[in-house]
C-alpha cells in the first residue's frame, strides 16, 4: 500500500513541478532540469527582494511551492518507513542485490509477491508481472510476440527502470559489463532492456 501511495505522490509532485516551471517560464524565469533547478526556482520565489517575480505572480506560485514542499515531506516520510522495514527484512535485502533494483524496488517486489510459492517457476513470476513475450500459434508453430504488458504495471516499471539503469552503467563502463556491451553493439538499447527484464524477474523469484 505505501509503495502505491508513494507512486501516486511522485506523480503528483511531477505534475506540480511541471506547473511550477511553466508559470515561471511565462515570466522568463527558467532553470536547469532536475532537483537543482527546482531548488533554484524555489529560492527565487521565496526571495521577496527578487524583482524578476511580480508581487501578484509570486502570490500564485507560492501556493505551488508550498504544495511541492508538502509532497516532498510526505514522500520522504514514506521512504523512511520503507528503508526501516528493508533493514529488518532479509528477503528484500537479497532482492536488492539484483543490479538496478535498489531498496524501493526490492521492498515493492517483496510486498507485492509476498508468497513466491504460488508461482511454479521464475518464468511464471515474470509472466504474472507482464514481462514475457506473448506466444502465438500459427500453422502449428509457436511464435514469440511482443511483451504482453499485462499484469502488475508497478512491478513491471521497477524491472524496466532497473534494466535501463544497468545498461546505462554498461555504456559508461563497458569493461565492467562486457556481455551487455556486446549485446548493445548488436541490438538497439530498448530491445536489450526489454530482453533483460524477464531475467531480472527470475532472479528476484529465486
What positions do the PLM features span?
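A detector of single, family-specific signature residues
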Residues: 1-206
Amino acid at each position: 500500500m505505501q509503495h502505491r501511495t508513494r507512486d501516486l505522490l511522485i506523480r503528483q509532485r511531477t505534475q506540480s513541478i511541471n506547473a511550477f516551471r511553466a508559470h515561471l517560464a511565462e515570466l522568463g524565469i527558467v532553470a536547469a532540469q532536475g532537483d537543482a533547478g527546482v531548488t533554484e526556482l524555489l529560492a527565487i520565489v521565496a526571495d521577496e527582494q527578487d524583482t524578476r517575480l511580480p508581487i501578484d505572480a509570486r502570490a500564485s506560485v507560492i501556493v505551488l511551492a508550498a504544495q511541492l514542499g508538502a509532497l516532498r515531506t510526505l514522500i520522504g516520510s514514506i521512504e523512511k518507513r520503507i528503508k526501516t522495514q528493508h533493514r529488518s527484512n532479509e528477503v528484500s535485502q537479497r532482492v536488492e542485490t539484483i543490479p538496478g533494483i535498489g531498496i524501493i524496488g526490492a521492498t515493492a517486489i517483496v510486498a507485492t509477491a509476498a508468497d513466491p510459492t504460488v508461482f511454479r517457476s521464475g518464468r511464471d513470476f515474470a509472466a504474472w508481472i507482464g514481462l514475457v513475450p506473448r506466444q502465438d500459434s500459427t500453422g502449428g508453430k509457436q511464435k514469440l510476440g511482443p511483451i504482453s504488458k499485462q499484469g502488475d504495471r508497478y512491478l513491471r516499471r521497477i524491472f524496466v527502470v532497473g534494466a535501463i539503469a544497468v545498461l546505462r552503467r554498461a555504456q559508461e563502463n563497458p569493461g565492467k559489463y562486457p556481455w551487455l556491451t556486446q549485446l548493445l553493439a548488436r541490438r538497439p538499447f530498448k530491445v536489450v532492456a526489454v530482453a533483460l527484464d524477464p531475467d531480472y524477474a527470475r532472479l528476484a523469484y529465486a
